């Protein structure tokens, strides 16, 4: 017993030390500084800045490397702990209803804003004068997309192939099936479930280690963007960029804000809570970079693991609010800029096609542009060659698309969890208010109690199973079951400095 108390005292001391961490050690501050330095380098030394692209690409590759195991462990263990397997279908069904509703609403918002503001009016550009070769690659990829092909691609060729390719929907498909099989097998699969729970510790520790490279990735990506495309490209099409950013801002704070308020939480508090993930997306233009951290934070905010594991990965393909706003807004901008008349009937056709083509857009940089090409290819009234107009500024709008997508998926997770009764309202309220302990993506605890709580979980081997719940103090009902290897993890696991 004394040994346990000594270990917990060490954990508390570690927490006190970490509570004094200076601001410059926080990941979001480092990412902000890296973005600023990247902008300056790209602006003053564009040749050097344009060569920084490998830094951003390398960081994205590192994160994508860990996404598959994070999704698998989260989904499989979450579903395995369900006593009612019908709940999996209910969660998926409610999530799809939410996705369809708000994705369509985002498309409509982009359409309405484009008609009211008309950002492309007065440009009088002849489509024949545009360089169609510049968008040939995107158009070719767009033609390869089809609804049937997208659905068939969800089924991997082999079990291992999904993890090798890193396809989010394929990994999610396998994870759901594996989690269901574990739940059906029941007690005989407890050893496997315990192993998966234990495996989450080093995997999420690896995520924290990889996130330490986030400032380098953000610096490289931003330096490349400014160095290659320059600030002049922003000025030339400032009306479109400004309209898109303002529309996304209003969608987040008015539409999603109303949804959040109706469901009992603040959109501002939620954005503050996931600020590290948003800054990471801002620096890398890739929403995939924030997926592991977002899943972790949504679970800590009180959403059940099974809901988080289903909603967020699925939302990365089916709930892309920012991409949807961009698609209809950009399509009408091209029509206005090239003086192409587009009737309300054409706009309805555009809306219907966009509802289909927007599903399955990947969370990587440039995916929105490919999806736009697929949409315009099916709408004969809008010249596809007009996409050359926005090719140079697409990178600058990619950040806003990705940030809006991330916020939309965070809201969706909380809402679906509440609909399903898998949300802890008190935990959500205290977490968003900043009163609850939050383990950041950098792996450092933001409050003293967080380190104590994490240490207790490691010490007592706590899992999601009810029989492993920690009493919360030395001498509690589970303290007598401490194993030597569990206590050793304090010094080699998540709490090691």
Curated annotation (Swiss-Prot):
Residues 475-484 have a biased composition (Basic and acidic residues). Induction: By succinate, fumarate, and malate. Expression depends on the RpoN sigma factor. Keywords: Cell inner membrane, Cell membrane, Membrane, Plasmid, Symport, Transmembrane, Transmembrane helix, Transport. Disulfide bonds: none annotated. Residues 466-497 are annotated as: Disordered. Its main location: membrane. It is found in: Cell inner membrane. The chain crosses the membrane at residues 27-45, 60-82, 95-117, 168-185, 205-227, 237-259, 348-370, 374-393. Responsible for the transport of dicarboxylates such as succinate, fumarate, and malate from the periplasm across the inner membrane. This transport system plays an essential role in the energy supply of tropical rhizobium-legume symbionts. InterPro entries: C4_dicarb_transport, Na-dicarboxylate_symporter, Na-dicarboxylate_symporter_CS, Na:dicarbo_symporter_sf. Belongs to the dicarboxylate/amino acid:cation symporter (DAACS) (TC 2.A.23) family. GO terms for cellular component: plasma membrane. PANTHER family: AEROBIC C4-DICARBOXYLATE TRANSPORT PROTEIN, PROTON/GLUTAMATE-ASPARTATE SYMPORTER. This is C4-dicarboxylate transport protein. It is a multi-pass membrane protein. GO terms for biological process: L-aspartate transmembrane transport.
């Amino acid at each position: 017993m004394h040994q346990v108390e000594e270990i917990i005292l060490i954990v508390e001391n570690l927490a006190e030390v970490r509570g004094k961490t200076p601001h410059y050690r926080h990941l979001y501050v480092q990412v902000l500084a890296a973005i600023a330095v990247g902008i300056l380098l790209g602006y003053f030394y564009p040749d050097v800045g344009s060569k920084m692209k490998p830094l951003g690409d390398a960081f994205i590759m590192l994160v994508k490397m860990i996404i598959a195991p994070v999704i698998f462990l989260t989904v499989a263990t979450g579903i395995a702990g369900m006593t009612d397997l019908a709940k999996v279908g209910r969660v998926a069904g409610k999530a799809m209803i939410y996705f369809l509703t708000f994705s369509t609403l985002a498309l409509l918002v982009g359409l309405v804003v484009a008609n009211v503001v008309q950002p492309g009016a007065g440009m009088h550009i002849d489509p024949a004068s545009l360089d169609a070769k510049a968008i040939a690659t995107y158009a070719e990829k767009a033609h390869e997309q089809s609804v049937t092909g997208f659905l068939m691609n969800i089924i991997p060729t082999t079990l291992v192939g999904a993890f090798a390719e890193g396809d989010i929907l394929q990994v999610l498909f396998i994870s759901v099936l594996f989690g269901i099989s574990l739940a059906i097998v029941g007690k005989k699969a407890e050893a496997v479930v315990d192993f998966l729970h234990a495996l989450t510790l080093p995997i999420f520790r690896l995520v924290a280690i990889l996130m330490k490279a986030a400032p380098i990735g953000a610096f490289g990506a931003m330096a490349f963007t400014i160095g290659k495309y320059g600030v002049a490209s922003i000025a030339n099409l400032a009306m479109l960029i400004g309209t898109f950013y303002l529309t996304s801002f209003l969608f987040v704070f008015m539409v999603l804000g109303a949804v959040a308020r109706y469901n009992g939480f603040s959109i501002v508090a939620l954005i503050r809570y996931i600020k590290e993930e948003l800054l990471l997306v801002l620096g890398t233009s890739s929403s995939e970079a924030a997926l592991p951290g977002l899943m972790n934070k949504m679970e800590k905010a009180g959403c059940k693991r099974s809901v988080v594991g289903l909603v967020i990965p699925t939302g990365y393909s089916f709930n892309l609010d920012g991409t949807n706003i961009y698609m209809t807004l950009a399509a009408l901008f091209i029509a206005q800029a090239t003086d192409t008349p587009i009737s309300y009937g054409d706009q309805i056709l555009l809306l219907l096609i966009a509802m289909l083509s927007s599903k399955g857009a990947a969370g990587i940089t440039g995916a929105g542009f490919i999806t736009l090409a697929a949409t315009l290819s099916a709408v004969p009234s809008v010249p596809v060659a007009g996409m050359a107009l926005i090719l140079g500024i697409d990178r600058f709008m990619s950040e806003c698309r990705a940030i809006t997508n991330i916020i939309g998926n965070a809201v969706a997770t909380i809402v679906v969890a509440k609909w399903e009764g898998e949300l802890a309202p008190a935990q959500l309220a205290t977490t968003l208010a900043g009163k609850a302990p939050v383990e950041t993506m950098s792996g450092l605890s933001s409050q003293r109690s967080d380190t104590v709580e994490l240490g207790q979980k490691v010490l007592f081997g706590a899992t999601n199973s009810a029989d492993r719940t920690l009493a919360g103090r030395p001498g509690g009902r589970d303290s007598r079951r401490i194993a030597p290897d569990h206590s050793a993890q304090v010094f080699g696991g998540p709490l090691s400095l």
